[in-house]
């Protein structure tokens, strides 16, 4: 029974998910259906949390829109997500960056992770 569930989960998981983590700036292309038309909507922001649970993996992205903080949670392997692109790697020392909710301006900045040779 357990093998059947694992096999079905592996079948439904996306293979093209890039490697990203908390602090990284990502652009998530989401399929939005309005009436009978379908289009792609980009959501760019900082990953503040990531949950790794196989098929049930999820991540939360936060951005500032018109001076207001907006957070959106995505299922990593959802068919509604067209693509995930990593724009910038962030250097952080926490797995969950919920403290960014209380911060704004320069104190909410995240240092960039430089590539190591």
From Swiss-Prot:
User: Which Gene Ontology BP annotations are present?
Assistant: translation
What PROSITE patterns is this protein classified in?
A: RIBOSOMAL_L19
Keywords tagged on the record: Ribonucleoprotein, Ribosomal protein
Q: Per its record, what are the GO molecular function terms?
A: structural constituent of ribosome
Q: List the disulfide bonds.
A: none
GO CC annotations on file: cytosolic large ribosomal subunit
For this protein, the record's InterPro entries field holds:
Ribosomal_bL19 (IPR001857), Ribosomal_bL19_CS (IPR018257), Ribosomal_bL19_sf (IPR038657), Translation_prot_SH3-like_sf (IPR008991)
What the entry lists under Pfam families is as follows: Ribosomal_L19 (PF01245)
What family does the database annotate?
Belongs to the bacterial ribosomal protein bL19 family.
NCBIfam families noted in UniProt? rplS_bact
Q: What does this protein do?
A: This protein is located at the 30S-50S ribosomal subunit interface and may play a role in the structure and function of the aminoacyl-tRNA binding site.
Name-wise, this protein is Large ribosomal subunit protein bL19
Q: Which organism is it from?
A: Shewanella amazonensis (strain ATCC BAA-1098 / SB2B)
Q: What is the lineage of its organism?
A: Bacteria, Pseudomonadati, Pseudomonadota, Gammaproteobacteria, Alteromonadales
């Amino acid at each position: 029974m357990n093998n059947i569930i694992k096999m079905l989960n592996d079948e439904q998981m996306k293979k093209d998910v890039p490697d990203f983590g908390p602090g990284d700036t990502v652009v998530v292309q989401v399929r939005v259906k309005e009436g009978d038309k379908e289009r792609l909507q980009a959501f760019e922001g900082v990953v503040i949390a990531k949950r790794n649970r196989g098929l049930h993996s999820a991540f939360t992205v936060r951005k500032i829109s018109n001076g207001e903080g907006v957070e959106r949670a995505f299922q990593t392997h959802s068919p509604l997500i067209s693509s995930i692109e990593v724009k910038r790697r962030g250097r952080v020392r926490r797995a969950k960056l919920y403290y960014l909710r209380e911060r704004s301006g320069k104190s909410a900045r995240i240092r960039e992770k430089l590539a190591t040779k």
